[in-house]
Amino acid sequence: HNEYYGALGVGSNNTLGSHPTFIRWAIRLRQLRLTQWLDSLKSHLSPQKEFSDNLMKYVVKEQVIPYKSKLFQQGLEQFQNNMKLVLNLFKKHQIPVFFSTVGVNLKDLKPFKSISSDEHSADEYYQLAQEQLQAQDSIAAYTSFSRARDLDALRFRASKEINEIIRELA
């Protein structure tokens, strides 16, 4: 998700801190010609980085973002603040908005990064869900698949909290 690994995400190398006001101020500053010129000058003077190995290694600072961690919460706050800004802009210009939650593949996509904790890991919940599905207990399997997704420490799929924020804002 962009709030975690995208430009200015809480887990990216290109972050400007976690305070939304500072981030918006820095984005506006980047629009100034002087800032763009200084950035261009810096890139010409700095040695070029080699991206052939793996772009993700360069872009992502914090690859592992555990569920309910400080970075996880910051990503949720950033998502909620960004959504509120966009919705306020649409409201100001009287533009209708249609909402949708984020769909994710629970069954066919194993957790990317499973870490052990006090409770079961993402991999353990995924395996349990597979067993529950085999036993034709689809409700329990759905719950376990959902828990595996939420515990996946590589934040490429929307957690249940993202959809809760969307529902709350709708």
Give residue spans per PLM region.
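Serine-dependent acyl-ester chemistry module
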Residues: H1-E168
